[in-house]
Amino acid sequence: MTNTKGKRRGTRYMFSRPFRKHGVVPLATYMRIYKKGDIVDIKGMGTVQKGMPHKCYHGKTGRVYNVTQHAVGIVVNKQVKGKILAKRINVRIEHIKHSKSRDSFLKRVKENDQKKKEAKEKGTWVQLKRQPAPPREAHFVRTNGKEPELLEPIPYEFMA
């Protein structure tokens, strides 16, 4: 067979619904509120063919720049050969969901504000930057009366 050039070529598993999730789309999908500036994940839903994003945007994260009755406009970065372009696409809300990529950052901002407030009241300095995990503390290894065994590599022998 020849290599077809259809819009949905190679999407047999990409746009298929998960096991036991076929049929009517849950109403919660339509009840979600999207505002300008929201960060959303694009994931095509095969149940709804209208307003489906192209397969190249599947799994990408973008920012909402426009909201209409049934769809939203999203700015997504797309790599075209050597350059990254900011593409503006219109996608129906069935094919997007709020991204969790910013949740950890926003949680950290709240915690840092709380730490700053407490430190200001006490008049102390507080470390706000995340620190890498330090090396483990020194400790003794129990051998249970057994002598440690010395391991060394076998010397190389050339066999002709």
From Swiss-Prot:
Function: Component of the large ribosomal subunit. The ribosome is a large ribonucleoprotein complex responsible for the synthesis of proteins in the cell.
Keyword field contains Endoplasmic reticulum: yes
SUPFAM superfamilies: Translation proteins SH3-like domain
Positions with biased composition (Basic and acidic residues): 112-123, 136-145
Keywords: Cytoplasm, Disease variant, Endoplasmic reticulum, Hypotrichosis, Ribonucleoprotein, Ribosomal protein
Keyword Cytoplasm: yes
Annotated gene: RPL21
This protein's name: Large ribosomal subunit protein eL21
Pfam family, one: Ribosomal_L21e
Gene Ontology MF term list: RNA binding; structural constituent of ribosome
Associated pathology: Hypotrichosis 12: A form of hypotrichosis, a condition characterized by the presence of less than the normal amount of hair and abnormal hair follicles and shafts, which are thin and atrophic. The extent of scalp and body hair involvement can be very variable, within as well as between families. HYPT12 patients have normal scalp hair density at birth. Hair loss begins during the first 6 months of life and gradually progresses to nearly complete loss of scalp hair. The remaining hairs grow slowly and are thin, sparse, dry, and fragile.
Record-stated family: Belongs to the eukaryotic ribosomal protein eL21 family.
Subcellular location: Cytoplasm, Cytosol; Cytoplasm; Endoplasmic reticulum
Originating species: Homo sapiens
Region (Disordered): 112-145
GO term, biological process aspect, one: translation
GO cellular component: cytoplasm; cytosol; cytosolic large ribosomal subunit; cytosolic ribosome; endoplasmic reticulum; membrane; synapse
InterPro entries named in the record: Ribosomal_eL21, Ribosomal_eL21_CS, Ribosomal_eL21_sf, Translation_prot_SH3-like_sf
